[in-house]
């Protein structure tokens, strides 16, 4: 009976001894390492890091998070091709310590949390674990690359869009002014044509072209008619001069004033007709 109990006790002790031996022989290693991540500006991220010391004895362990300035492009490419957690090539002298955690035991873990990341946060982050189990302190490292994408378009792109918008809106304004100028030119042409057409029409009561009156009588009648018309126009303008706006309209309607002007007043037309009928027989005799 006692022999059976001893065998049973040995059966329980053997697995425990084997487990303890495995823990003692096992090397210190990372159980969780940070991974490369790409985020947008303003996002929140977490980088895990966990380490287990060799053996079951309680040791003093320390874990630190470091931020390394952005390495050269060729080193970034090399880091992207390497295995995360096994990097030890980035040793930037401008490294900045972020946090430190120290425990007494054989396991340690610490998560790095970054909130509202910025473009300047891009770079390599390193998890350093110091193992004080032996006389000589052992240091283990695991690195991860953080890439931050811009949430908005670059400023030079916005400036280029603004310049292109200004350049595209310029011809439209020029085209509108050209249209207005062409309309004004068309109106001026129409006014000139109307004026020339009005100048060609003979005044009321004037003798038709090709009549049998001699050339001398016709010239005298024309001179007398011109003088009478000028005197009547001067008297009408001195008695009641129209406003400047109406004068401009009259000039636009009857021409620039270089040729003989004819008034549209019916009384003046009747007066001119009477003078013409009175002077025509006298000049004929």
Curated annotation (Swiss-Prot):
Ig-like V-type domain location: 29-143
Top-level taxon: Eukaryota
Name used for this protein in its record: V-set and transmembrane domain-containing protein 2B
Region Disordered: start-end pairs: 160-225
SMART domains: IG (SM00409)
Location of the protein in the cell: Membrane
Pfam name, any one: V-set
Major location (coarse): membrane
Database matches in Gene3D superfamilies: Immunoglobulins
Keyword terms, alphabetized: Disulfide bond, Immunoglobulin domain, Membrane, Signal, Transmembrane, Transmembrane helix
Extracellular side: 29-263
Biased composition (Low complexity): 176-189, 208-225
GO cellular component, one term: membrane
Annotated organism of origin: Mus musculus
Gene that this polypeptide is encoded by: Vstm2b
Residue numbers on the Cytoplasmic membrane side: 285
InterPro entries, alphabetized: Ig-like_dom (IPR007110), Ig-like_dom_sf (IPR036179), Ig-like_fold (IPR013783), Ig_sub (IPR003599), Ig_V-set (IPR013106), IgSF_V-set/TM_domain (IPR051102)
Keyword Nucleus recorded: no
């Amino acid at each position: 009976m006692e022999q059976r109990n001893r065998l049973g006790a040995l059966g329980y002790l053997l697995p425990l001894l084997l487990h303890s031996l495995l823990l003692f022989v096992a090397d210190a290693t990372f159980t969780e390492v940070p991974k490369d991540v790409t985020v947008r500006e303003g996002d929140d991220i977490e980088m895990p890091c966990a380490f287990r010391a060799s053996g079951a004895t309680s040791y003093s362990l320390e874990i630190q998070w470091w931020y390394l300035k952005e390495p050269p492009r060729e080193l970034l490419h090399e880091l992207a091709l390497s295995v995360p957690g096994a990097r030890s090539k980035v040793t930037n002298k401008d490294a900045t310590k972020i946090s430190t955690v120290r425990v007494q035991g054989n396991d340690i873990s610490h998560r790095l949390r970054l909130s509202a990341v910025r473009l300047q946060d891009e770079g390599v982050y390193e998890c350093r674990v110091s193992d004080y189990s032996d006389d000589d302190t052992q240091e283990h490292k695991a690195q991860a690359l953080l890439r931050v994408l811009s949430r908005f378009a670059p400023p030079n792109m916005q400036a280029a869009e603004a310049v292109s918008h200004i350049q595209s809106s310029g011809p439209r304004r020029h085209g509108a002014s050209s249209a207005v100028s062409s309309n004004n030119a068309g109106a001026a042409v129409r006014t000139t044509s109307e004026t020339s057409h009005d100048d060609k029409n003979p005044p009321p009561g004037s003798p038709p072209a090709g009549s049998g009156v001699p050339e001398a009588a016709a010239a005298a009648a024309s001179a007398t008619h011109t003088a009478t018309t000028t005197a009547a126009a001067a008297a009408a303008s001195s008695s009641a001069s129209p406003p400047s706006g109406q004068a401009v309209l009259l000039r636009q309607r009857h021409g620039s004033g270089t040729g003989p002007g004819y008034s549209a007043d019916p009384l003046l037309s009747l007066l001119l007709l009477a003078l013409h009928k009175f002077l025509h027989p006298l000049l004929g005799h």
